[in-house]
Amino acid sequence: MSYKRGTCLGFIMLLMVSHHHTKGKPLSSLQNLSRLLEDNFERSFGSDEADQQLVPTDSLDQLDPELQWNKNRLEQGDSPHVNEMTLQQLLNDPVGTSRRYRQRNKKGYSRGCFGVKLDRIGAFSGLGC
């Protein structure tokens, strides 16, 4: 009995000692954290230099006319008219949207090998799957 108790206590002490040696130093200040971030990302997070290096978006639009076209297209796509139209289509055809999901089962679509529902193997092409 004492042998088991001694082994258990020895194992616990070994765990405590190994845990004490493997712990790292805690980062206690914000400076240590910011230094760690700067080392990892090679950029200073607290400086204004990063803001000055950014190119304004207006100059990009002047350089490339396709960027201007994409920006205009995205702005037009976010109009409420498009969203209302999509909502209206969904409300007008609730049966059509649910019809797609009726034919599904747990394993997916109930279709054969090539997208056609088969009654038996090889009925469509004579070759099977």
UniProtKB/Swiss-Prot annotation:
Q: Where in the cell is it found?
A: Secreted
An annotated GO BP: growth plate cartilage chondrocyte differentiation
Q: Does the keyword Secreted apply?
A: yes
Write out the propeptide range(s).
25-107
Q: Which InterPro entries match?
A: C_natriurtcpep (IPR002406), Natr_peptide (IPR000663), Natr_peptide_CS (IPR030480)
The protein's UniProt keywords, in alphabetical order, are:
Cleavage on pair of basic residues, Disulfide bond, Hormone, Secreted, Signal, Vasoactive
Note the SS bond partners: 113-129
Cellular compartments per GO CC: extracellular region
**Per its UniProt record, what Pfam families does this chain match?**
ANP
Leader sequence segment:
1-24
According to the UniProt entry, its GO molecular function terms are: hormone activity
- Predominant place of localization: secreted
Q: What does this protein do?
A: Hormone which plays a role in endochondral ossification through regulation of cartilaginous growth plate chondrocytes proliferation and differentiation. May also be vasoactive and natriuretic. May be important for freshwater adaptation.
Sequence similarity: Belongs to the natriuretic peptide family.
Name used for this protein in its record: C-type natriuretic peptide 1
Organism (species):
Aquarana catesbeiana
